[in-house]
Amino acid sequence: MATRPGPLTEWPWQWMGGYKYLVLAPVAMHTAHRLATKGWGDFDPAYTFMLPTLLLRMIHNQIWISLSRYQTARRKHLIVDRSLDFEQVDRVLYLDDQIILNGLLFYLGYAIIPNFRLMPVWRTNGALITILLHMGPVEFLYYWFHRALHHHFLYSRYHSHHHASIVTEPITSVIHPFAEHLAYFLLFSISILPPIFMGCGSVLAGVLYITYIDFMNNMGHCNFELMPKWMFQTFPPLKYLIYTPSFHSLHHTQFRTNYSLFMPFYDYIYNTMDSSSDELYERSLKGTEETPDIVHLTHMTSLKSTYHLRIGITSISSKPCNDSVWYMWMLWPVAWLSMVLAWIYGSSAFVVERLKLKKFSMQVWALPRYNFQVMDSSALGKVSPSTILIEKAILDANEKGVKVLSLGLLNQAEQLNGSGELFAKKYPRLRVRLIDGSGLATAVVLNSIPFGTKQVFLCGSNSKVTRATAIALCQRGVQVILNQEKEYGMLKSRVPESRAIYLKFSNDETPQIWIGDSIDDAQGRAPKGTIFIPTSQFPLKKARKDCTYLSNPAMKIPETMQNVHTCENWLPRRVMSAWRIAGILHALEGWEMHECGDDMMTIEKTWSAAIKHGFKPLTKPCSLNSGTDL
């Protein structure tokens, strides 16, 4: 929103929320009626291309968003290296408003302009007129209109909404008040309407012109430099005819320079070109390689989790993952295509996120594999494709000089690699420290148990964290009850003999505190009011309304952590899993040991370090020193 919003700032359908697409319902109904009564033979090229054009524009924009986020995470050709936060993401989510407006105006033009319905697929003379009109009147008028928008009166009421984003993304290009979009539509109509009225317009010329506008807008706001130098060396006048991402980025950081639409020519002749334009272009194009201090290695979960990656769909990745949302089912074809591409081309981990805390830089790498691929039962017990990918990522991190690599989700599965022990033993001279995060995860689980708890039910002990939690509770005088003989026998051999009395096998007792990694299937046996505390990285199925479900082991991150604008899987905003935080703490504290296999950081030590560095528990902290405080 602008600093002092003026008339026509909000979109007319803003009050409709997620139902705003209903404004296109009359158009859809008219199309359906026309198809039912007259058949496909009555559809002319202009009418036929309208809906596909709108859909292709949305796909085109999404490709740019994904490409930009991937490149800025890699950082090499980054232009503006500043933090991006949730406030900006929420402000720029609604790129589809422009598509809806354009759809309505296109259909309106089709209905009232006879020549619109007579356009052929292609006419060269009309396309040339469109190009000339854009290079002349459109670029010229836009330049002066843009300068006018930077006058205090219009800037405070309208254009400041766009400039609230100093760190730009492709989506920033269409984030303007409604009134500005109307003005831009009229401006671009100067290139489209005259050929139509002259009888030389064509459908393809219009579609290509709109695609050109979208391409240049997205490129100018992508925040990484990609225009090759050889283009300007081969044809020097080109620097006056096409801008670069760094050229327009200066407009967002300096505000009163580089006003041109797509052709810097007008900034040159009116002396408003930023003097550092060439230098910033050279520096951004050359780029610098960044070696992160910390890497968190994750992977995709379900097929639809592709959209939840930072390089996926912005409106989805900025919220906790929810596969049950209705529109996710509409995207199934894209999910399947992503899986196929990941299987064919996914030979290594790729960067999806870049963060910073204090002097430490962090990256998130994702393996191009899903849950069902990582834990493929046919590959367990032998070297699986996922194990090879994890090993390759570890060796890449080691070669680059990464200090700490934390294993997320199933990348640390005991059945797969012994919580990372396989790699630590195979490569004893690894400089990068491998972290499974079990120490901090156990500390968070212990901290989540209500004060005064004397008895807990352990549901499953398949994970390192679950076993460590049970042993810690016994050592603190809290009775741990199991109803599985095999698990009971395994745990009893690990609990100190003096504390074995606190480990109990029983089929009759059901305390109201349930802890473990296999809770989902056993929830029906829990008494009313039970508190479920998971030890797994995956969320519980909330099958009971009369029970309380706590989060997976996780903590709130410090306010000083920069560039956080996506959610980690199903966790809330600015919350990280304990396994991921453990890797960060390892680097912050300068700890030298691996935490993998049977090795685990001291629970009290990791908890104290987390609190010291500004991480906060999601629940009220409990003492870790005695059972009575649990």
Curated annotation (Swiss-Prot):
It is found in: Endoplasmic reticulum membrane. This is Very-long-chain aldehyde decarbonylase GL1-7. Keywords: Endoplasmic reticulum, Lyase, Membrane, NADP, Transmembrane, Transmembrane helix. GO terms for molecular function: aldehyde oxygenase (deformylating) activity; iron ion binding; oxidoreductase activity. Residues 133-272 form the Fatty acid hydroxylase domain. It comes from Oryza sativa subsp. japonica (Rice). InterPro entries: CER1-like_C, Fatty_acid_hydroxylase, Sterol_Desaturase_Related. Belongs to the sterol desaturase family. The chain crosses the membrane at residues 93-113, 126-146, 185-205, 325-345. The keyword Membrane applies. It holds the Pfam family CER1-like_C. It is a multi-pass membrane protein. One of its GO terms (cellular component) is endoplasmic reticulum membrane. Signal peptide: none annotated. It comes from the Eukaryota. The gene is GL1-7.
